[in-house]
Amino acid sequence: MLDILLPILIFSALALAAIGAVRRIRLWRQGRPSPVPVLRGLAAVPRRYLVDLHHVVARDKVMSNTHVATAGGFVAAMGLAIVVHGLGLAEGVLGWLLLAASATMFAGSLFVARRRRNPPARLSKGPWMRLPKSLMAFSLGIFVVTLPAVGVLPADAGGWLVALVLAAVVAWGLAELVFGMTWGGPMKHAFAGALHLAFHRRPARFSDKRGGEGRSTGLKALDLDDADAPLGVEKPADFTWNQLLGFDACVQCGRCEAVCPAFAAGQPLNPKKLVQDMVVGMVGGSDARYAGSPYPGKPVGEHAGDPHGPIVAREGTALVDAETLWSCTTCRACVEECPMMIEHVDAIVDMRRHLTLEEGATPGKGAEVIDNLIATDNPGGFDPGGRLNWAADLDLPLMADVERAEVLLWLGDGVFDMRNQRTLRALIKVLRAADVDFAVLGNEERDSGDVARRLGDEATFQSLARRNIDTLSRYRFESIVTCDPHSFHVLKNEYGALYPQGQDADYPVWHHSTFINQLIESGRLPLAPGQAQRVTYHDPCYLGRYNGEYEAPRAVLRALGMELVEMQRSGYRSRCCGGGGGAPITDVPGKQRIPDMRMGDVRETQAEQVVVGCPQCTAMLEGVVPPAGNEATAVKDIAEMVAAALDNTPPATPASHDTAASQATEEVLS
């Protein structure tokens, strides 16, 4: 009897899944075009799954092993079940392989069931709570019905009643895991996730065959000359089709929710919920069906679902509140933690672009900052002719005078800030101590455009960027060095797309911590370690998660003889200071302030100082008032730490200095 029922069940489930797949693909194709290399993408799926996806999953060893057993067992068991029971080819080892695959899957499902007994708050509930039962039903059912195929049990064991029961168990598993995979069930992520890996919007994120780490973090430029292209995203169809596919790949594990600084601060942003809102906006349904945790203080509702209907509005009457979008600091912690490699920040900035460019709805001081950038080329509205007033006593060489230098020192967006001027003075002292041939643009330098772009004003960003590019192209230099990770990021990763056709950004861009470390390692900047201090280092988001630089600042601190103690959240899991993405400008209230939480992390280390490498981090962390009875922890830029150490370093002899400088020049410029 099972010989008749099992092929019917298996091929019926596959047929219904195929119908659901076509329906789902049609929904994704409502999005804007996005060319992808189809065959190359499909061929890359195994490597992207086994290397890149599991690189994230493996951070939790237990869940990594569980996922390998459950997912690997299911794929193998389903494929073998089609051959053994669907096609009736049970000869040889195929039946035994199916037993092994289903047993492996069952073992993995036991761990899934254990995790679902007391799930952490970040895990979605609803249909996901029945997933362990479905996994166990399918794996156990397939295991038992395969025993007669390999001769362990007689073909008619148990009679027709047992056969019907086993067929019902297998049907339950097939309905949830195969049919439900393309009809919005908990296994939807398996179908959408595989295609998402193949047709990812950022294929450069994936590691290459040589083992190199992939990284693609620059925002995509809007084509402002295309009159038919939407200025940002108002409705699901305004996303590219593979962005919609990516949202559908969400496994609702809540890792993004757990690391989001805005969510932790009680602001109305939950990145997991936001991704599910994109799905709900496309296909409809109740938010509660898709997500376990709503936004802080936001009701859970229903949406009819329409790819061409608005999902964001300035007054918060649509599915996504404007306040949700403006709460994001663009720290990229959610993207870094996502095992499905979904691009939350891209989606948020896309919707911000609509609010800013189409509706002029930038909250807080956003409109004032953008007006200042347009009128004065700086966010504070200061006289652009006064960019170097603070450095009148430093006699800084100007590129307009020298036309050529080893290093172009990019002063950055905080050049008018008195606190940041102290950092710049320290960096200039370090460069001169290392005998670096550098020059500055002076009044020719404009704001990098970072804050305009993060606030959604792509037009102002592109205007600033193109004028800066025109200025840079007039001079000769070996590299750009800056102490601002935000300027560093846009210069390195976002300006390249705006260069005129036929021109390239043919210069490296260094964060000052990396450049200082190069100088130390090459012997160009000899340091005598001073008195050891207990310090902790705060990783700037735009240096660490955006650009993968974690080691150089720590190497500099070790060279200074510092006792470095790490915060619990450091490196790629560093907590944001709250200063990125224009968040201090839009100023969406929450239950607590993000920088207060970060300084709480600092106090737990009992460090004497917290070392930073970003002017925004400095401003945010220094603005924290310590709790009663606690002394304020000093906040120092890494350039200030090195400059202070220079006061304790005896000068090198002229001969040895010249030799070291010559060798270092060759190394830095090679």
Swiss-Prot record:
SUPFAM superfamilies: alpha-helical ferredoxin
Transmembrane segments: 2-22, 68-90, 94-113, 135-155, 159-179
Keyword Iron part of the UniProt annotation: yes
Region feature (Disordered): 648-670
Keywords: 4Fe-4S, Cell inner membrane, Cell membrane, Iron, Iron-sulfur, Membrane, Metal-binding, Oxidoreductase, Repeat, Transmembrane, Transmembrane helix
Taxonomic superkingdom: Bacteria
Cofactor mode of binding and number, as noted: Binds 2 [4Fe-4S] cluster per subunit.
A single cellular component GO annotation: plasma membrane
Membrane-related topology note: Multi-pass membrane protein
Cofactor: [4Fe-4S] cluster
Compartmental location: Cell inner membrane
Functional description taken from the UniProt entry: Participates in the electron transfer process during N,N-dimethylglycine (DMG) degradation to sarcosine. Probably transfers the electrons from N,N-dimethylglycine/sarcosine dehydrogenase (DMGDH) to the electron transfer flavoprotein (ETF) EtfA-EtfB.
Protein's name in the database: Probable membrane-anchored ferredoxin csal_0991
